[in-house]
Protein backbone atom coordinates (compact mmCIF):
# COMPACT_ATOMS: atom_id res chain seq x y z
CA UNK A 1 0.00 0.00 0.00
CA UNK A 2 1.21 3.57 -0.59
CA UNK A 3 2.66 4.98 2.62
CA UNK A 4 2.75 8.62 3.72
CA UNK A 5 6.05 10.38 3.07
CA UNK A 6 7.90 11.17 6.29
CA UNK A 7 8.75 14.87 6.55
CA UNK A 8 10.64 16.79 9.23
CA UNK A 9 11.22 20.50 9.93
CA UNK A 10 14.95 21.17 9.61
CA UNK A 11 17.52 23.92 9.26
CA UNK A 12 15.93 25.81 12.16
CA UNK A 13 19.15 26.80 13.91
CA UNK A 14 20.31 30.42 13.77
CA UNK A 15 23.90 31.58 14.07
CA UNK A 16 25.40 29.93 17.16
CA UNK A 17 21.98 28.83 18.42
CA UNK A 18 21.27 25.19 17.63
CA UNK A 19 17.80 23.74 17.10
CA UNK A 20 17.10 20.11 16.26
CA UNK A 21 19.23 17.08 15.49
CA UNK A 22 19.19 17.30 11.71
CA UNK A 23 22.20 15.05 11.13
CA UNK A 24 20.64 12.25 13.17
CA UNK A 25 17.16 12.52 11.62
CA UNK A 26 17.95 13.06 7.94
CA UNK A 27 18.75 9.39 7.10
CA UNK A 28 15.25 8.31 8.17
CA UNK A 29 12.97 10.80 6.40
CA UNK A 30 11.77 11.31 2.84
CA UNK A 31 11.36 15.08 2.91
CA UNK A 32 13.20 17.92 4.69
CA UNK A 33 11.21 21.11 5.34
CA UNK A 34 13.99 23.70 5.44
CA UNK A 35 13.46 27.05 7.17
CA UNK A 36 13.99 30.02 4.89
CA UNK A 37 15.13 32.75 7.27
CA UNK A 38 11.88 34.32 8.46
CA UNK A 39 11.24 32.20 11.58
CA UNK A 40 14.65 30.55 11.85
CA UNK A 41 17.82 29.72 9.90
CA UNK A 42 20.39 31.85 8.12
CA UNK A 43 22.10 31.52 4.72
CA UNK A 44 24.88 29.24 5.96
CA UNK A 45 22.51 26.91 7.80
CA UNK A 46 20.13 26.82 4.84
CA UNK A 47 22.89 25.75 2.47
CA UNK A 48 24.36 23.18 4.87
CA UNK A 49 20.94 21.64 5.46
CA UNK A 50 20.28 21.43 1.72
CA UNK A 51 23.66 19.72 1.27
CA UNK A 52 22.79 17.24 4.02
CA UNK A 53 19.49 16.43 2.31
CA UNK A 54 21.27 15.87 -1.01
CA UNK A 55 23.78 13.58 0.71
CA UNK A 56 20.95 11.35 1.95
CA UNK A 57 18.73 11.53 -1.15
CA UNK A 58 16.01 13.47 0.69
CA UNK A 59 13.59 15.84 -1.06
CA UNK A 60 14.00 19.51 -0.14
CA UNK A 61 10.92 21.52 0.74
CA UNK A 62 10.64 25.24 1.40
CA UNK A 63 9.34 26.01 4.90
CA UNK A 64 8.25 29.66 4.71
CA UNK A 65 6.83 31.54 7.68
CA UNK A 66 5.65 34.90 8.92
CA UNK A 67 8.59 37.27 9.60
CA UNK A 68 8.85 36.39 13.29
CA UNK A 69 12.30 35.33 14.46
CA UNK A 70 11.60 36.18 18.10
CA UNK A 71 8.43 34.10 18.18
CA UNK A 72 9.78 31.27 16.01
CA UNK A 73 6.95 31.90 13.55
CA UNK A 74 4.31 30.76 16.01
CA UNK A 75 2.55 34.13 16.30
CA UNK A 76 -0.13 35.17 13.83
CA UNK A 77 0.45 38.43 11.98
CA UNK A 78 -2.21 40.55 10.32
CA UNK A 79 -1.08 39.93 6.73
CA UNK A 80 -3.17 40.24 3.60
CA UNK A 81 -3.34 37.38 1.09
CA UNK A 82 -1.06 39.38 -1.23
CA UNK A 83 1.47 39.86 1.56
CA UNK A 84 1.40 36.12 2.25
CA UNK A 85 1.90 35.44 -1.46
CA UNK A 86 4.89 37.79 -1.67
CA UNK A 87 6.61 36.64 1.54
CA UNK A 88 6.28 33.02 0.47
CA UNK A 89 7.70 33.74 -2.99
CA UNK A 90 10.64 35.57 -1.39
CA UNK A 91 11.45 32.65 0.89
CA UNK A 92 11.02 29.93 -1.74
CA UNK A 93 13.37 31.85 -4.01
CA UNK A 94 15.99 32.17 -1.27
CA UNK A 95 15.99 28.42 -0.65
CA UNK A 96 16.05 27.69 -4.38
CA UNK A 97 19.33 29.58 -4.65
CA UNK A 98 20.89 27.28 -2.06
CA UNK A 99 19.39 24.25 -3.80
CA UNK A 100 20.89 25.18 -7.15
CA UNK A 101 24.28 25.65 -5.51
CA UNK A 102 24.02 22.07 -4.18
CA UNK A 103 22.65 20.49 -7.37
CA UNK A 104 19.01 20.07 -6.42
CA UNK A 105 15.68 21.94 -6.56
CA UNK A 106 12.86 22.85 -4.21
CA UNK A 107 10.43 19.92 -4.48
CA UNK A 108 7.43 21.15 -2.46
CA UNK A 109 6.29 23.90 -0.08
CA UNK A 110 5.18 23.53 3.54
CA UNK A 111 4.27 26.74 5.39
CA UNK A 112 5.35 26.95 9.03
CA UNK A 113 3.69 27.51 12.36
CA UNK A 114 1.11 30.28 12.59
CA UNK A 115 1.08 30.80 8.82
CA UNK A 116 0.27 27.11 8.32
CA UNK A 117 -2.50 27.25 10.92
CA UNK A 118 -3.95 30.52 9.61
CA UNK A 119 -4.11 29.09 6.08
CA UNK A 120 -6.18 26.18 7.40
CA UNK A 121 -8.71 28.63 8.88
CA UNK A 122 -8.78 31.36 6.22
CA UNK A 123 -9.45 30.34 2.59
CA UNK A 124 -8.17 33.69 1.32
CA UNK A 125 -4.79 33.23 2.97
CA UNK A 126 -4.70 29.71 1.54
CA UNK A 127 -5.49 31.20 -1.86
CA UNK A 128 -2.56 33.61 -1.43
CA UNK A 129 -0.25 30.71 -0.61
CA UNK A 130 -1.48 28.82 -3.66
CA UNK A 131 -0.81 31.85 -5.87
CA UNK A 132 2.77 31.92 -4.58
CA UNK A 133 3.27 28.27 -5.52
CA UNK A 134 1.69 28.78 -8.94
CA UNK A 135 3.83 31.85 -9.62
CA UNK A 136 7.00 30.00 -8.68
CA UNK A 137 6.37 26.53 -10.13
CA UNK A 138 2.87 25.14 -10.78
CA UNK A 139 4.23 21.59 -10.42
CA UNK A 140 5.19 22.02 -6.76
CA UNK A 141 2.89 20.39 -4.19
CA UNK A 142 1.68 22.54 -1.29
CA UNK A 143 1.37 20.86 2.11
CA UNK A 144 -1.79 21.63 4.06
CA UNK A 145 -3.24 20.48 7.35
CA UNK A 146 -5.41 17.38 7.07
CA UNK A 147 -8.79 17.89 8.74
CA UNK A 148 -11.97 15.88 9.23
CA UNK A 149 -13.48 17.76 6.26
CA UNK A 150 -10.84 18.17 3.54
CA UNK A 151 -13.41 18.88 0.81
CA UNK A 152 -13.21 22.72 0.91
CA UNK A 153 -9.41 22.71 0.59
CA UNK A 154 -9.59 20.12 -2.18
CA UNK A 155 -12.15 22.22 -4.06
CA UNK A 156 -9.99 25.35 -3.82
CA UNK A 157 -6.92 23.42 -4.95
CA UNK A 158 -8.82 22.09 -7.97
CA UNK A 159 -10.07 25.59 -8.78
CA UNK A 160 -6.54 27.03 -8.57
CA UNK A 161 -4.80 24.08 -10.23
CA UNK A 162 -2.55 23.31 -7.25
CA UNK A 163 -1.48 19.88 -6.00
CA UNK A 164 -2.19 19.48 -2.28
CA UNK A 165 -0.49 17.04 0.03
CA UNK A 166 -2.52 16.59 3.20
CA UNK A 167 -0.28 16.41 6.25
CA UNK A 168 -0.80 14.59 9.53
CA UNK A 169 1.31 14.47 12.70
CA UNK A 170 2.59 11.46 14.60
CA UNK A 171 3.23 13.26 17.87
CA UNK A 172 0.27 15.64 18.20
CA UNK A 173 -3.23 15.26 19.63
CA UNK A 174 -6.24 16.16 17.49
CA UNK A 175 -9.61 17.72 18.25
CA UNK A 176 -12.86 16.31 16.75
CA UNK A 177 -12.57 18.61 13.69
CA UNK A 178 -9.15 17.17 12.92
CA UNK A 179 -7.24 20.26 14.00
CA UNK A 180 -4.15 20.11 16.17
CA UNK A 181 -4.77 20.66 19.87
CA UNK A 182 -3.01 23.85 21.00
CA UNK A 183 0.45 23.29 22.44
CA UNK A 184 -0.76 25.22 25.49
CA UNK A 185 -3.20 22.43 26.34
CA UNK A 186 -2.13 19.42 28.42
CA UNK A 187 -1.58 16.31 26.32
CA UNK A 188 -1.25 18.27 23.08
CA UNK A 189 2.14 16.73 22.30
CA UNK A 190 2.85 13.00 22.61
CA UNK A 191 6.18 12.12 24.20
CA UNK A 192 5.84 8.35 24.56
CA UNK A 193 7.63 6.57 21.71
CA UNK A 194 5.14 3.72 21.51
CA UNK A 195 2.21 6.13 21.31
CA UNK A 196 3.91 8.14 18.55
CA UNK A 197 4.68 5.04 16.48
CA UNK A 198 1.17 3.66 17.01
CA UNK A 199 -0.39 6.92 15.78
CA UNK A 200 1.91 6.94 12.74
CA UNK A 201 0.95 3.37 11.83
CA UNK A 202 -2.76 4.10 12.34
CA UNK A 203 -2.54 7.06 9.96
CA UNK A 204 -0.51 5.09 7.42
CA UNK A 205 -3.11 2.33 7.39
CA UNK A 206 -5.93 4.83 6.87
CA UNK A 207 -7.55 3.82 10.15
CA UNK A 208 -9.38 6.26 12.45
CA UNK A 209 -7.61 8.13 15.25
CA UNK A 210 -9.14 8.86 18.62
CA UNK A 211 -9.67 12.62 19.04
CA UNK A 212 -9.18 14.36 22.37
CA UNK A 213 -12.90 14.03 23.18
CA UNK A 214 -12.88 10.28 22.54
CA UNK A 215 -14.56 10.44 19.13
CA UNK A 216 -13.16 8.68 16.06
CA UNK A 217 -11.48 10.79 13.42
CA UNK A 218 -10.59 9.94 9.82
CA UNK A 219 -7.79 12.00 8.26
CA UNK A 220 -6.24 11.88 4.78
CA UNK A 221 -2.48 11.36 5.07
CA UNK A 222 -0.27 12.01 2.05
CA UNK A 223 2.61 12.91 4.33
CA UNK A 224 3.40 12.52 8.02
CA UNK A 225 5.35 15.08 10.04
CA UNK A 226 7.89 13.82 12.55
CA UNK A 227 10.24 15.80 14.77
CA UNK A 228 13.90 15.53 15.70
CA UNK A 229 14.17 18.02 18.54
CA UNK A 230 15.85 15.66 21.03
CA UNK A 231 17.25 12.14 21.39
CA UNK A 232 13.85 10.68 22.31
CA UNK A 233 12.16 12.11 19.23
CA UNK A 234 14.99 10.88 16.99
CA UNK A 235 14.47 7.38 18.40
CA UNK A 236 10.77 7.70 17.59
CA UNK A 237 11.57 8.68 13.98
CA UNK A 238 13.78 5.61 13.60
CA UNK A 239 11.02 3.43 15.03
CA UNK A 240 8.46 4.92 12.63
CA UNK A 241 10.79 4.22 9.69
CA UNK A 242 11.18 0.62 10.85
CA UNK A 243 7.40 0.29 11.21
CA UNK A 244 6.81 1.75 7.74
CA UNK A 245 9.39 -0.60 6.25
CA UNK A 246 7.42 -3.44 7.81
CA UNK A 247 4.14 -2.12 6.38
CA UNK A 248 5.73 -1.90 2.93
CA UNK A 249 6.51 -5.61 3.07
CA UNK A 250 2.94 -6.60 3.95
From Swiss-Prot:
It catalyses: 5-oxo-L-proline + ATP + 2 H2O = L-glutamate + ADP + phosphate + H(+). Pfam families: LamB_YcsF (PF03746). GO terms for biological process: carbohydrate metabolic process. It comes from the Bacteria. Keywords: ATP-binding, Hydrolase, Nucleotide-binding. It is an enzyme of class 3 (hydrolase). One of its GO terms (molecular function) is ATP binding. Its EC number is 3.5.2.9. HAMAP family: PxpA. PANTHER family: 5-OXOPROLINASE SUBUNIT A (PTHR30292:SF0), UNCHARACTERIZED PROTEIN YBGL-RELATED (PTHR30292). Belongs to the LamB/PxpA family. Forms a complex composed of PxpA, PxpB and PxpC. Catalyzes the cleavage of 5-oxoproline to form L-glutamate coupled to the hydrolysis of ATP to ADP and inorganic phosphate. This is 5-oxoprolinase subunit A. The gene is pxpA.
Amino acid sequence: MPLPLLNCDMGESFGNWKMGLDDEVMPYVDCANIACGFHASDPGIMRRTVALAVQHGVRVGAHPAYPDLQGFGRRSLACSPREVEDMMLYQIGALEGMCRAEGTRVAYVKPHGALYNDMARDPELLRGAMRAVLAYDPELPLLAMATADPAPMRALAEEMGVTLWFETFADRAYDPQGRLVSRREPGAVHHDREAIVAQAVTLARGEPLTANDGSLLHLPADTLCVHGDNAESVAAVRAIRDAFDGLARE
